[in-house]
Amino acid sequence: MLRSFALVVGVTLAAGVAQAQAPQPPEIAARTYMLVDITANQILAAKDIDAPVEQASLTKLMTGYLVFDALRAKKIDLQQKLPVSVRAWKMPGSRMFIDPKMQVAVDDLIKGMIIQSGNDATMALAEGVGGTAENFVKLMNEQAKALGMTGTSYKNPEGLTEPGHLTTARDLSVLATRLMHDFPQYMHYYSTKQYSYPGTPPSNGNNRNSLLFRDPTVDGLKTGHTAAAGYCLVATAKREFPNVGTRRLLSIVLGTSSENARANESQKLLNWGYTAFDAVKLFDAGQAVATPAVWKGKENTVKMGRAEAIVIAVPAGSAGKVTTHISHQDPLVAPFTKGQAIGALKVSLGDESVRDVPLLALDGVEQAGVMGRAWDAMRLWIK
């Protein structure tokens, strides 16, 4: 059984927002697009986000994820030098301009893959981590499945056009979000504006993401282009707001007509998201949303909430129309561990449900002794 009670907050809501009340996004000239408020964990705008599309070099987001995972597991290190195979050297498309006579540090190869979008650097990393490109692709698909990217299939590590090498805007949002969350220590690569490996053409050094040069709040992530995919960009920005702090948005535009178009449409989406929606902090990180009674435990109550702040994206001017309902397991019987889901915060705008936030035990509660459990069992029976 769940016990619930209502709380009118005068602030809150977000966006999966009731369609009748959601702000209408600007006209976006892209095959498919998506705007996500990462801070509030809400979709603000979307078009055809489950349609299969060519990935182009957005593929390198997954390659990067696996390289960072290998670094975390200490299978490789940043200063380790990897060989450049003939296969890597002969990769077509964007290049870092490395060759088989070189041994290149992982740190430089990551820069070559992300900043220059080098297919040669990407192949060298894939072979270094996976042993072979084919084995690395297996790892890519296994990781996609683990992340819940149900519309994605990888055929290569760099993103060149190949039958069945497909993804969706929704899956890219999942990957980008997890990339930023799981590996914050490596996100500086995506905001670096220029890089050239010593002895290679300096004209090749500018980051393909032109928003980095236009908007100081943009700090990533990755461009892509092939004839089949069109011009694509997964971009992210963070801006500061009173009472909320840093608010991060993620835009995905796929299948635009030019480099300039992908930057313009991404900028349009980001600016619209920051102005059409307000961010409202409902609860601080670690703050008790409610303190329900505990049965058969060494403690009589437990605080439930979230380790991170609970923030909601609200259509501008709509905060006063929001209500929340808090529910929890009833009876709430020990034992349970810190971080275990024991309730939910339901947010509504008017009569329409907007978002459900799982509420976790902020502390664990051990089971009481025999006498304590027996006493509570009798009380529950009477109840």
Residue ranges of predicted features:
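Active-site-adjacent loops and short helices of periplasmic peptidoglycan-processing enzymes
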Residues: 20-184
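Domain-terminus/edge residues, biased toward the C-terminal soluble/receptor-binding domains
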Residues: 150-153, 161-166, 170-383
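Bacterial Sec-dependent signal peptides at the C-terminal "C-region" and cleavage site
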Residues: 16-22, 360
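Bacterial N-terminal signal peptides
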Residues: 4-15
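Positively charged, low-complexity intrinsically disordered regions
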Residues: 4, 20-22, 307
